[in-house]
């Protein structure tokens, strides 16, 4: 189904070449101050055309809020927001209409539903994440307004180039809010949203792939700062399980890890366990190998998450596919321009999914009143 | 909450040192032939004491089915199964009663619920996965009986030692059912459930860690063989999202990947995309880099999943913690014997979660009738 | 929350005086032929101003479909439909802004959410049932297209005047589809949607109440014809429980009954039980006292439901209330014109809720494929 | 499915002649003091054999709690409770094995699931309400402990005999807690759980039906006292909708009403609307025609609900049915003794469902902390 969350629920709808795309947000308590601009800002961060590594289609993605906000505040009723599609010009699809693109969900959708929207992936297009970002913008506002929680994302690896900036190289850095604000500015001013010193090297790597008519993936790190202790549930409705499901639900994601993640498989127990100590009146972990979550529940340390993003499947190179009508092998050449890398544009989407997950579990864990704040 | 699944639902209950642990399975269609023995066999696979790397507590874990099966077949009503705890002798907990164990959820539970079951982790104990395995055994039977789907798991890495057997080194191997049966036998006869040639080296690695009073993690690969094309949903209720949530919900899991996973971040689009070709009358992928899932929906190729398991947090070494009464730093020494590695025992649990997820989505995708088979 | 249904889900949003109202329909299988006109027709049936007993505000309620339908058929993706509000002129609310209207949810909303939309009830307005009707129109089409199921509603009582036409007076009548078509025409041509011979008497009753600046209630009967045997579930997700929840969810409904309903409390078991007999090759009930449902599951006989509708709470008479600012008792006089009876306008809304419920349970019971038809 | 509730969830399982029946309660916050005896007392109220109007099968219905309670308090983990079946002697079912009983769900289950438990209805038996009562007992304790809410039920009509005691004849009576305690005692000492002066007349009416080998229905009123203002939600997850779904989910229930219910259809708006006035510092309704709920949300007045209970379908009279093997009409005579009326035994079940619903919505409305109290 197209709904994410149990107590703070986001239902998204819309196709890449339909009339509009949007989301209905249900379960946001009343009295949250929020404006259309707050949400528009987040939409602008994922909009195409914002850097050299993004398709130059200059979609405006202008938000309209149709319900749920009255006199500048949420009312407790569902918030409906949408973006009308503009400039989705009817181009010539005849070449690819019956030839599913490798790496895309075209064939899958066709076999499952008996139809697919050949005009650009329909519901499987990355464009549908507009709904995620609308929902995420409200969730971000809610958790920041009530608990001063910040969510920040950046790339730590592009293709084969490792960056030099990640949480575990800089744990103390993340203890200061002003550091985080400076970091955010740095990220937003970088075309790869990468705060590493060697980001120019990464840039060249992507430019080189563009020359080869190819595409590139990467790794994104998401930090959730300020989440109180106790958010999440044991067993099945875990904080990490919900975050994992949220992130893996983004089509390009092929891997997910928390804290030390895959590296933890190589450590001894005595290396991995975070020792406790008294820090003034509260109990803290000396390290944060666990990434801020144990047994489904937040520890109070920053939550550290990483995802692997596959290279964009749309490439200009000729690829091998089949023709669905003739049932014969057929080469396919996807015209137009494509994002050579979607890592930077996925970042606000992952931040949105993190925000929705945290808002949802903070309501169900009793940290945010479900009716009004 | 303690329920997993939407259409095939497993609700687990019970604590490590309570009277019993169990599961209620709701949504299994009627007419599935199943016996207590089928379920008991799976429970035996996760039972402690089955190898040198598992605690010698010889819990019997004897299953009782109390409802939902009549005259050897499911009836369509909820299946309630449980295991009474035996031999959970009341030992002396006074030393650790007020000192949360690092790496465990003790402190988290205490801060969240205002209580914790100091007798062995209560609900956060690995022992609660008995419920997962009861549910998984029914799900395995359902998907094997109706669609001949097989789920097989094994370790591919122990501590720092990489194995030489995994799906990508042997893709053709997995095309034969008799190969899979032989593989299963090999796995079950190995104390680390590792089919690699160098498993003795891994064994030594674990024995060495035991000598050091330490513990070891590893990586597990789970293959789902025979899943038809079209299982799963776009956007939020994706096959990969549900599997991710299911696996990450197991306490020791710190990372999850599908297909090429984290490696995909290093590939070019032209390397990662699986080309299509006509194989007799059906469309197949030349490779399976995507791991059998695109856009939330199964492609018909084997589903390939990998998880990272952290080292067991219970170790005999002295560790640093705090006393919850005195609010002072305190060393903790956890007595008794512990599993130096839980990787092999987690395998049947992950297989169970995979089976429940697949059963659930096959019902909601219309592959298995929700009422009767 | 604002979502109804589990497998066929309708999420409604919007307020009476907001920018727009609408619904997102999730879980409708692909390939259902449907047009905007199909949905518009149902919206027209609940639109104000269609008879002398309805407010003369001539809202156009023009539907727009923004997603989920491609080339005249559903695609399996969420269907988003909405109606922009027009002519909700900003009138002078100063008199009633702080004085909750008796019989309305104004006070309740204010105390719960700390705000209320004084411009006409906001989310508690009957106008929000536009979303229900959009969802219901799709559901009606789905169950009619796949199983030829018809849902028909009419009033059987207006105020104190009992009608002479209901299911139990005419059980054989409902066995013919052409009878049902004629009945539908008769209902739609009657301002009270009442097929009884004495409907003129009822009309006078309402006119008399209008003269007294008062309002009138009534009883509605809903028949679901053609529902196959086996729809619904035992215990908690029952056909009757879901229908009851759906109907009671409409604000004006204060009572709900199935089959003989409250009358069944007066019968002996030997009178109430429907005997079985062989009718050609199938087993039928001689009577249908149970109203087509036993134990949560449809019997194959027509489903017979009745609801009690309270008189419209908006009346022109002076009423007693309190001022929320001064905390003093205050009289309130609600200006403008109001529906003296909403019974006829509630009928398409109840039909919609019945259709959504039946569609939802037919999918979860395996009668309609969840992916494509 | 077999789960009721969203935030306070009760999953019931078990069949009338299986090994055991029980419930898993998920979402009860930690720190609620509760004993097995608290739950056993409620089970005793619904146990057969407690009066002359109940089958003399003296099932002990001895409760066992297997998880979720530690040192006399809930722990926040799932509470698993069950009752082992005893003395379900294997009697001779050969006469009725293939002949579905009129008024029961036998035929329905058989056609839906391809099997039915001929030994006494299996999952459709009233005996499965043991699970409801286990869940309800915990919910009652939770809402009484945290908010002093009382739920009380009694019969107001037996067969054709109207009682003289109901809420609307005695609204002031219900304002005193000591009155309610006295009322409860009177109810529990009456074999029909009827506090009316003419209950002896009702008793004779049932005895007369027993002589005729027939059965009798009735009407039950349930009062929820002390529920705070604001519980419930607009639109679909309404307090009245949830209560309706909960009550209609009990097999014998054929009608449900709130407040004036069906009578409200006969009233004018000016009669039905409850006027507001200032009562010291709070706003109260002068009357409670609405039954304590408007627009999905509690008003703070007592919640008044009524249900119609059909006569017990099991009667000793010869009835007409069909043989499922021979497909011929066949008479059926159901041997053994049966409850001539189940109205009094249904009362604790309805109270349980009311308690679960209120607990669930108080958690989701922010009145009860979801984690710990």
UniProtKB/Swiss-Prot annotation, chains A, B, C, D:
A Pfam family annotated for this UniProt entry: Chorismate_synt
InterPro entries assigned: Chorismate_synth, Chorismate_synth_AroC_sf, Chorismate_synthase_CS
Keywords: Amino-acid biosynthesis, Aromatic amino acid biosynthesis, FAD, Flavoprotein, FMN, Lyase, NADP
Gene Ontology biological-process entries: amino acid biosynthetic process; aromatic amino acid family biosynthetic process; chorismate biosynthetic process
Entry EC no(s): 4.2.3.5
Cofactor binding annotation: Reduced FMN (FMNH(2)).
Binding residues annotated for NADP(+), in chain numbering: 46
Reactions accelerated catalytically: 5-O-(1-carboxyvinyl)-3-phosphoshikimate = chorismate + phosphate
PROSITE patterns: CHORISMATE_SYNTHASE_1, CHORISMATE_SYNTHASE_2
GO terms under cellular component: cytosol
Molecular function terms from GO: chorismate synthase activity; FMN binding
Cofactor: FMNH2
Highest taxon, organism lineage: Archaea
Pathway this chain belongs to: Metabolic intermediate biosynthesis; chorismate biosynthesis; chorismate from D-erythrose 4-phosphate and phosphoenolpyruvate: step 7/7
Positions contributing to FMN binding: 123-125, 251-252, 295, 310-314, 337
Biological role: This reaction introduces a second double bond into the aromatic ring system.
Family the UniProt entry places it in: Belongs to the chorismate synthase family.
Name of the featured protein: Chorismate synthase
Species assigned in the record: Methanococcus maripaludis (strain C5 / ATCC BAA-1333)
């Amino acid at each position: 189904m197209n709904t994410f969350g149990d107590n703070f629920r986001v239902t998204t709808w819309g196709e890449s070449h339909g009339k509009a795309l949007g989301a209905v947000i249900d379960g946001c308590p009343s009295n949250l101050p929020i404006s259309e601009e707050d949400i528009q800002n987040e939409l602008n961060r994922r909009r195409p055309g914002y850097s050299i590594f993004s398709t130059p289609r200059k979609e405006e993605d202008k938000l309209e809020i149709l319900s749920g906000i009255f006199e500048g505040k949420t009312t407790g009723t569902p918030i409906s927001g949408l973006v009308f599609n503009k400039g989705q010009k009817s181009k010539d699809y005849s070449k690819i209409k019956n030839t599913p693109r490798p790496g895309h969900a075209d064939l899958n959708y066709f076999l499952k539903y008996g139809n697919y929207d050949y005009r650009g992936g329909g519901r499987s297009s990355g464009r549908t994440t507009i709904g995620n970002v609308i929902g995420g913008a409200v969730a971000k506002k809610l958790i920041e307004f009530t608990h001063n929680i910040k969510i920040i994302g950046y790339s730590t690896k592009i293709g084969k180039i490792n960056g030099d900036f990640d949480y575990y190289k800089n744990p103390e850095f993340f203890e200061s809010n002003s550091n985080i604000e400076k970091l955010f500015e740095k990220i937003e001013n970088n075309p790869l949203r990468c705060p590493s010193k060697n980001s120019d090297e990464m840039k060249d790597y992507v430019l080189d792939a563009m020359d080869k008519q190819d595409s590139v993936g990467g790794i994104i790190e998401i930090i959730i700062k300020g989440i109180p202790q106790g958010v999440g549930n044991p067993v099945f409705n875990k904080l990490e399980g919900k975050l994992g499901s949220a992130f893996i639900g983004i089509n390009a994601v092929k891997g997910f890890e928390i804290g030390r993640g895959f590296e933890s498989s190589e450590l001894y127990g005595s290396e991995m366990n975070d020792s406790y100590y008294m820090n003034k009146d509260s109990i803290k972990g000396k390290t944060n190998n666990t990434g801020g979550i144990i047994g489904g529940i937040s520890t109070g340390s920053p939550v550290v998450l990483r995802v692997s993003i596959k290279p964009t499947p749309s490439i200009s190179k000729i690829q091998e596919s089949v023709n669905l009508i003739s049932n014969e092998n057929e080469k396919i050449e996807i015209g137009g321009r494509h994002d050579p890398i979607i890592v930077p544009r996925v970042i606000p989407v992952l931040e949105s999914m993190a925000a929705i997950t945290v808002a949802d579990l903070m309501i169900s864990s009793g940290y945010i009143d479900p009716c009004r704040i």
